[in-house]
Amino acid sequence: MAKYYIFITGGVVSSLGKGITAASLGSVLESRNLKVTLMKLDPYINVNPGTISPIQHGEVFVTEDGAETDLDLGHYERFIKTKMSKKNSFTSGKIYSEVLKNERKGFYLGSTIQVIPHITNEIKKCIINAGKGFDILLVEIGGTVGDIESLPFLESIRQMSIEIGKNKILYIHLTLVPYLKISKEVKTKPTQHSVKELLSIGIQPDILICRSEKNVSKYEKSKIALFCNVPKQAVFSLKNTNSIYKIPILIKKQGLDSYVCDRFCIKRPEADLSKWKEVIYKQKNPLGNVNIGIIGKYTELPDSYRSLISALEHAGLKNRLMINIQLINSKKIESLGISCLKNLHAILIPGGFGYRGVEGKIIAAKYSREKKIPYFGICLGMQVALIEFARNVTGLSEANSTEFINNCKHPVIAKISEWNKSINYLNKSNISSNNYSTMRLGNQKCHLTKGSLAFKIYNNSIILERHRHRYEVNNIFIEKIKFSGLSVSGWAYYDNHKLVEIIEYSNHPWFVGSQFHPEFNSTPRNSHPLFISFVKAAFDFKNKNI
């Protein structure tokens, strides 16, 4: 188990930024030479977010070991050095599924299965496993205190203070302190009621973090401390900011990390946040800007592409450029045409599932190829680029994916089983199963072709990148497409078989498609080489076409 546990709950409203707050505090504690990890506990009944609509829930973040998790795990990886895994993300559905599986196997010896103790014991077991080998485990409890779904998780963390010891447990409650513009004052009553709700469950928060449009004054902090039964010095303020990367600095400035260390009697050097200060400086002082269009079908909710947007921002920091991101719905392109793509310096088509909006993406890929606008296709974005090329350059006029048309004449994209019948091959491809189909998930090796653009960008012959897809480029059509000018610069090998990982078009300044998701490996302090190169190509295109 971890030496110490910090549990972070949220009150008043949802979407207060518990994940970013937890990740930021973790980053500052990590800078004090502590070994830190994080964990997300989600109250919803889905086993994982893999089948939830991105419009409802945001993106699915994929870990190295292939877990489909909440987008907050992406924030965790972007703020701390520790990589997340399947043990860092649990939902009510996953917990209940494990308990029911154990019951069927007879593990409970005929006991009546109940929320207490069976569900709560399983939750505690998962928390302890996630913290093994670390100094501090920060656990974010999803949802809002008062929600019926989160009660088993709150009961579990209450029990842990008794079983492990209060000196090793810290409860942080993140709450909203609304600012009323009419009266020009902040209101503390919602926070008082939220803490009262937490107390009714048996949890006394040790620290309160107040989210507000304005800084919470000393008087207001004293009032909150008095009525919420916490010391004045344990009430902290986090006002709205224009950059999430300022949060570690704000936390350090207010001494939250020092308060945590003092509470746990930890003696460590002061945090060195010079890297974060460098990030903020570059963000505030760009030397130029570029317009990049993300062509997708979940554009109503930017969080559907959270890691992607972040990766572009990270590459902007590296290139000292401000990235003006335009989220363009591909259905709009189908109805209005390429007029939606004017004034873009680069086009990026991300991953996705289903036929809706695909033809709009194909139009965008064609426009990018013909106008020599830098193009980056990720997962489905690579596949639509290949479909477009096969149709309009190779001459396979009915090229398509069997995901969209089962019996298409030229299935240039298909499931492996549709063009390779080797059962052993499927078993060796590190394909994980769910209730719906098979997918390649998590880290996979990719071998790069020497002399290719991809090889130059990575400066390596073998790379590891994360995948989340079930359809592949159909090898039957590869030679014909390559003969037309599209090259394959990255391959995944399984026994004597291989799968396309990266495509390039040499008759173009920058035209790259990757079957994997490089955005999951980008951080503000270490941006991904593919995105760095892509953003630079966008700036070069802008300067060339002034």
Curated annotation (Swiss-Prot):
PROSITE patterns: GATASE_TYPE_1 (PS51273). CTPSs have evolved a hybrid strategy for distinguishing between UTP and CTP. The overlapping regions of the product feedback inhibitory and substrate sites recognize a common feature in both compounds, the triphosphate moiety. To differentiate isosteric substrate and product pyrimidine rings, an additional pocket far from the expected kinase/ligase catalytic site, specifically recognizes the cytosine and ribose portions of the product inhibitor. GO terms for biological process: 'de novo' CTP biosynthetic process; pyrimidine nucleobase biosynthetic process. Pathway: Pyrimidine metabolism; CTP biosynthesis via de novo pathway; CTP from UDP: step 2/2. CTP binds at residues 14, 147-149, 187-192, 223. The keyword ATP-binding applies. Mg(2+) binds at residues 72, 140. The active site is at 379 (nucleophile), 517, 519. It comes from Wigglesworthia glossinidia brevipalpis. One of its GO terms (cellular component) is cytosol. Residues 1-266 are annotated as: Amidoligase domain. This is CTP synthase. ATP binds at residues 15-20, 72. It catalyses: UTP + L-glutamine + ATP + H2O = CTP + L-glutamate + ADP + phosphate + 2 H(+); L-glutamine + H2O = L-glutamate + NH4(+); UTP + NH4(+) + ATP = CTP + ADP + phosphate + 2 H(+). InterPro entries: Class_I_gatase-like, CTP_synthase, CTP_synthase_N, GATASE, GATase1_CTP_Synthase, P-loop_NTPase.
